[in-house]
From Swiss-Prot:
InterPro entries attached to this UniProt entry: P-loop_NTPase, RecF/RecN/SMC_N, SMC, SMC3_ABC_euk, SMC_hinge, SMC_hinge_sf
CDD domains reported in the protein's UniProt record: ABC_SMC3_euk
Keyword list, A-Z: Acetylation, ATP-binding, Cell cycle, Cell division, Centromere, Chromosome, Coiled coil, DNA damage, DNA repair, Meiosis, Mitosis, Nucleotide-binding, Nucleus, Phosphoprotein, Ubl conjugation
Modified residues (N6-acetyllysine): 105-106, 140
Organism: Rattus norvegicus (Rat)
Stated name of the protein: Structural maintenance of chromosomes protein 3
Subunit organization: Forms a heterodimer with SMC1A or SMC1B in cohesin complexes. Cohesin complexes are composed of the SMC1 (SMC1A or meiosis-specific SMC1B) and SMC3 heterodimer attached via their SMC hinge domain, RAD21 which link them, and one STAG protein (STAG1, STAG2 or STAG3), which interacts with RAD21. Also found in meiosis-specific cohesin complexes. Found in a complex with SMC1A, CDCA5 and RAD21, PDS5A/SCC-112 and PDS5B/APRIN. Interacts with MXI1, MXD3 and MXD4.
Region (Disordered): 242-268, 1059-1090
Any one GO CC term of the record: chromosome, centromeric region
């Protein structure tokens, strides 16, 4: 083992962390100038290892901290790393670090970074070979000089430290202290024995009078015992009688409380029934209000439908009359039209004949006029043209123009002909289209009527379903109110259960549920969810008669949480703490419960509690853990007997417990606050609530949902029908619009037909005139150019003039006649088209509309709706009447329940008054019992105070009455007054002092033996100390001579033990080996004393001659230092350490002696590590490793 590395920070001159290079296991030399920090390095190692720095005050710790410029150092540490490859330190590591940290308010040791105490460090170093009695493995600067100049007594002190006499001295001091304490005790015992002897002599004289006193006192105590015993027996009899009365009263009170509880249960049941009935009434009244509102709405709808049906019926009746009237009017219109058409048929041929004659006359007039014009033009061309050729040229040009004009006329005539033909064809086509549209219109009307009928059928069905849904809604509302009442009742029961349970436990249960909900939401830890089974109370059932004893037995264990394993509970608790949830939870992990089978006593007076519980066998361990060692007993007496005999907990049905350890607990238990009863009520309420919710969901809501779906389907059908209706009505309107448009087109074409015909006639007449002119011009072409008309042409002109006059006159006559006929035709046609036919169309349209209404679709649908609404009104009124009857019956039931409530209240009050009366009586009996118990205690106390009595005292006076006893007692007291001055405790004191004397004598003998043992121990210690000094002196003296000869070859040195008497009046010197023959010479006892040694002298001869031996005072400074070094080496060889630290031990030596010291260190470094500081070269030569220090 050796120092491998030193780390220093903040210590003295070392501000920053300084790591000293790894040291060699042999000789290490540190060189440096003065003030470079060599000594502080040694101080740092001493700071960790030496006792010198063991108890530092705050100011001393601050003095060790580095002081310099810059920030203040608040802590420092020195760490030494040891090479422990030889396992010299009892630590199984090759490297061991020891650090000491100091600050203004701390001083701590760390071994391998773990904090340890100073004593642990010192013990560890001692186990490695560091001796507290030999501090010379560290030699500080100046220590050599100090030893060189030290007196002999100081060297003797050093020798005693090396020999380890400190331990002997410490034990001797302890022995002296014990001896002084023992001596003091012996003196006190002697004083007490002297006092007791004197007191016993006095008490011997008082014993005679005391005998007489004791005689009468014995009689007095016997009499008093008899009196007290009789009073005690009388009191016990009264107490037994009172206990019987209390038991009877208690039984009666229990019966009254049970009756009172039954009354309260009945009242609570009645209150619950009243609440339910009131809720039912509220629901029925609310339903009645809804029915009333529905009935008002239904009556309103019925009134509307009745009015609508009446209007429709009136309309149908009126339509029948109107139809008759319209048909009659239509017939008249048809007759008039036929008459007018007949008139028109008679007039049109005349008109056509006159018109044809007129057209022919006009055509002939135009032709004759054109011919005459041509003849006059022919006559005029004689003067117009100068020559025949010029005329022919003009004629040709004119013929060309005429041909073009004739062609244009022909084209116009052909176009008009085509137009007239098209008009006629369009007229036929229009008529066909009109007939086709009329047929389509009839089909659309039939389809619309069918859709109307279907629409009203679907609507009636929808109204019926809505009425059924309204009824179901009312039912659902009633069920919802019942559900709300049940939920409120459940919340009240849960609140009562919460009030009977601790807040911390409830918070714990809620928190566990939150953790499990968190797992479920996250979908994690499924095995934890499956492994949690709820609290104990929710996992078993039992008869109500056992509720009290079961609940008292389990206590808060009812709320322990059952889990499959400790892993499940750990997972839950980890999440519980992670979520920082409140509450208190206790788990029962089934895999960790160690439950053994219990042998129950076979008796008819007790049964195992666990046999009365019903639970899942899977949780058998949990229930055996809680209830397995408890018996239900018939009475407290049975409980007490069985608890003692079978070491089991016993309990009565009333909850009175007897622990197997002997403790008794019991008293009145309020069953109204039974948590099991409350839990049963909560569970029952939850089941009823679940049944109501299931009923609501399965029946009503499912039917409502079904009806809603059907209504939605019917609404969709109605929408589809309405869409089809709109489509067909739009088609009907479009068809009517097309028919009207076709009719208007036909009338328009008829209006334009006659003008086109007249235009055609005019164009044809004009064409004939133009053709006649063209023929005339062609005939003239090539003829001679006349100057005047020929005779024939003149005749023709005259004839044409006569014809034109006749035609004009005839045409005027025809025109007048045509105008007259045309006026008749126009008037007749106007009357037909604008009056008769238009009115006929209106009549036909009204008849069509009447035919649509006469279909009865609307009236049928309205009648059907009216029947349905009447049925709903009837049903609503019937339901309302039923509700009125139910409300009356329910209110009557409430009144009956309230009467019953009053009866039970009165009964409960009577029971309460009886209980209060019994309670007062019980209090009186309790007070009396207390007084009797007090009297009993007083009697028993007085009997105890009488002390021990002879056997005859218990029987001698038993036959006497109290009066006789008191008379004898009075006589005794009179006699006892004569001995009032007697020390009544003389005998007791005599006995007491005698016993004390014996004890003190025994104690004195023990102290004498102890004193002798201490003296023997001190002699042994003194002998061992003497032997240790002698042995150490021999070893050191021998080592000193050998080391000195090696340091100074040929020289001689010896140690001399100096002696003297104890007083110090004489002294003598003893050389090496003479001490043992002189043992004990300086002591008057048989045990030699070390006090005879006065010092250790040194005698040396540097020449080796015996005659030149000199004392230390006669040596030079260098010689003294060398001798001191030799002594240190001798001490170290006597008590070797793992390593040594020398701080400038060679500063006073010359070069030759420094070389000798270096060789000595080199020799010793084979078995131990040396760390030395120097600024001389000699030590460096033998160093295995050297390093420099600089500031």
């Amino acid at each position: 083992m050796y120092i491998k590395q030193v780390i220093i920070q903040g210590f003295r001159s070392y501000r920053d962390q300084t790591i000293v290079d790894p040291f060699s296991s042999k000789h290490n030399v540190i060189v440096g100038r003065n003030g470079s920090g060599k000594s502080n390095f040694f101080y740092a190692i001493q700071f960790v290892l030496s006792d010198e720095f063991s108890h530092l005050r705050p100011e001393q710790r601050l003095a060790l901290l580095h002081e310099g410029t810059g920030p203040r150092v608040i802590s420092a540490f020195v760490e030494i790393i040891f090479d422990n490859s030889d396992n010299r330190l009892p630590i199984d590591k090759e490297e061991v670090s020891l650090r000491r940290v100091i600050g203004a308010k701390k001083d701590q040791y760390f071994l391998d970074k773990k904090m340890v105490t100073k004593n642990d460090v010192m013990n560890l170093l001692e186990s490695a070979g560091f001796s507290r009695s030999n501090p010379y493995y560290i030699v500080k600067q100046g220590k050599i000089n100090q030893m060189a100049t030290a007196p002999d007594s100081q060297r003797l002190k050093l020798l005693r430290e090396v020999a380890g006499t400190r331990v002997y001295d410490e034990r001797k001091e302890e022995s002296i202290s014990l001896m002084k304490e023992t001596e003091g005790k012996r003196e006190k015992i002697n004083e007490l024995l002297k006092y007791i002897e004197e007191r016993l002599h006095t008490l011997e004289e008082e014993k005679e009078e005391l005998a007489q006193y004791q005689k009468w006192d014995k009689m007095r105590r016997a009499l008093e015992y008899t009196i007290y015993n009789q009073e005690l027996n009388e009191t016990r009899a009264k107490l037994d009688e009172l206990s019987a009365k209390r038991e009877t009263s208690g039984e009666k009170s229990r019966q009254l409380r049970d009756a009172q509880q039954d009354a309260r249960d009945k009242m609570e049941d009645i209150e619950r029934q009243v609440r339910e009935l009131k809720t039912k009434i509220s629901a029925m009244k609310e339903e009645k209000e809804q029915l009333s509102a529905e009935r008002q709405e239904q009556i309103k709808q019925r009134t509307k439908l009745e009015l609508k049906a009446k209007d429709l019926q009136d309309e149908l009746a009126g339509n029948s009359e109107q139809r008759k009237r319209l048909l009659k009017e239509r017939q008249k219109l048809l007759e008039k039209i036929e008459e007018k058409q007949k008139e028109l048929a008679e007039t049109e041929p005349k008109f056509n004949s006159v018109k044809e004659k007129e057209e022919r006359g006009i055509a002939r007039l135009a032709q004759a006029t054109q011919e005459r014009t041509d003849l006059y033009a022919k006559q005029g061309r004689g003067s117009q043209f100068t020559s025949k050729e010029e005329r022919d040229k003009w004629i040709k040009k004119e013929l060309k123009s005429l041909d073009q004009a004739i062609n244009d006329k022909k084209r116009q005539i052909a176009a008009i002909h085509k137009d007239l033909e098209d008009t006629e064809a369009n007229k036929e086509k229009n008529l066909e289209q009109y007939n086709k549209l009329d047929q389509d219109l009839n089909e659309v009307k039939a389809r619309v009527e069918e859709l109307d009928r279907k629409y009203y059928e679907v609507k009636n069905k929808k109204d019926e379903l809505q009425s059924e849904r309204n009824y179901l809604w009312r039912e659902e509302n009633a069920e919802q109110q019942a559900l709300a009442a049940k939920r409120e009742d459940l919340e009240k029961k849960q609140q009562l259960l919460r009030a009977a349970t601790g807040k911390a436990i409830l918070n714990g249960i809620d928190s566990i549920n939150k953790v499990l909900d968190h797992f479920r939401r996250k979908g994690i830890n499924q095995h934890v969810q499956n492994g949690y089974h709820g609290i104990v109370m929710n996992n078993f059932e039992c008869e109500p008669a056992f509720y009290t004893c079961v609940e008292v037995t389990a206590g808060n264990r009812l709320f322990y949480h059952i889990v499959d394993s400790d892993e499940v509970s750990t997972k839950i608790l980890m999440e519980f703490n992670k979520m920082n949830l409140p509450g208190e939870v206790t788990f029962l992990p089934l895999n960790k419960l160690d439950v053994r089978d219990t042998a129950y006593p076979e008796t008819n007076d007790a049964i195992p509690m666990i046999s009365k519980l019903r639970y899942n066998p899977r949780f058998d361990k949990a229930f055996k853990h809680v209830f397995g060692k408890t018996l239900i007993c018939r009475s407290m007496e049975v409980s007490t007997q069985l608890a003692r005999a079978f070491t089991m907990d016993c309990i009565t049905l009333e909850g009175d417990q007897v622990s197997h350890r002997g403790a008794l607990t019991g008293g009145y238990y309020d069953t109204r606050k039974s948590r099991l009863e409350l839990q049963k009520d909560v569970r029952k309420a939850e089941e009823e609530l679940g049944e109501l919710e299931a009923k609501l969901n399965e029946n009503l809501r499912r039917n409502i949902e079904r009806i809603n779906n059907e209504i939605d389907q019917l609404m969709n059908q109605m929408q589809q029908i309405e869409t089809q209706q709109r489509k067909f009505k739009a088609s009907r309107d479009s068809t009517l619009s097309e028919m009207k448009m076709l009719k208007e087109k036909r009338q328009q074409s008829e209006k334009t037909f006659m003008p086109k015909q007249r235009s055609l006639q005019s164009l044809e007449a004009s064409l004939h005139a133009m053709e006649s002119t063209r023929e005339s011009l062609k005939a003239e072409l090539g003829t001679d150019l006349p100057s005047q008309l020929s005779l024939e042409d003149q005749k023709r002109v005259d004839a044409l003039n006569d014809e034109i006059r006749q035609l004009q006159q005839k045409n005027r006559q025809l025109l007048n006649e045509r105008i007259k006929l045309e006026g008749i035709i126009t008037r007749v046609e106007t009357y037909l088209n604008e009056n008769l036919r238009k009115r006929l169309d209106q009549v036909e349209q009204e008849l069509n509309e009447l035919r649509e209404t006469e279909g009865g679709t609307v009236l049928t649908a309205t009648t059907s709706q009216l029947e349905a609404i009447n049925k709903r009104v009837k049903d609503t009124m019937a339901r309302s009447e039923d509700l009125d009857n139910s409300i009356d019956k329910t209110e009557a039931g409430i009144k009956e329940l309230q009467k019953s409530m009053e009866r039970w209240k009165n009964m409960e009050k009577e029971h309460m008054d009886a209980i209060n009366h019994d309670t007062k009586e019980l209090e009186k009996m309790t007070n009396r019992q207390g007084m009797l118990l007090k009297k009993k205690e007083e009697c028993m106390k007085k009997i105890r105070e009488l002390g021990s009595l002879p056997q005859e005292a218990f029987e001698k006076y038993q036959t006497l009455s109290l009066k006789q006893l008191f008379r004898k007692l009075e006589q005794c007291n009179t006699e006892l007054k004569k001995y009032s001055h007697v020390n009544k405790k003389a005998l007791d004191q005599f006995v007491n002092f005698s016993e004390q004397k014996e004890k003190l004598i025994k104690r004195q003998e023990e102290l004498d033996r102890g004193y002798k043992s201490i003296m023997e121990l001190m002699n042994v210690l003194e002998l061992r100390k003497y032997e240790a000094i002698q042995l150490t002196f021999k070893q050191v003296s021998k080592n000193f001579s050998e080391v000195f000869q090696k340091l100074v070859p040929g020289a001689k040195a010896t140690l001399v033990m100096k002696k003297g008497d104890v007083e110090g009046s004489q002294s003598q010197d003893e050389g090496e080996g003479s001490g043992e023959s002189e043992r004990g010479s300086g002591s008057q006892s048989s045990v030699p004393s070390v006090d005879q040694f006065t010092g250790v002298g040194i005698r040396v001869s540097f020449t080796g001659k015996q005659g030149e031996m000199r004392e230390m005072q006669q040596l030079s400074g260098g010689q003294k230092s060398l001798v001191a070094l030799a002594l240190i080496f001798a001490i170290q060889k006597c008590d070797p350490a793992p390593f040594y630290l020398f701080d400038e031990i060679d500063q006073a030596l010359d070069a030759q002696h420094r070389k000798a010291v270096s060789d000595m260190i080199m020799e010793l470094a084979v078995h131990a590590q040396f760390i030395t500081t120097t600024f001389r070269p000699e030590l460096l030569e033998s160093a295995d490793k050297s390093s420099g220090k600089s500031e």
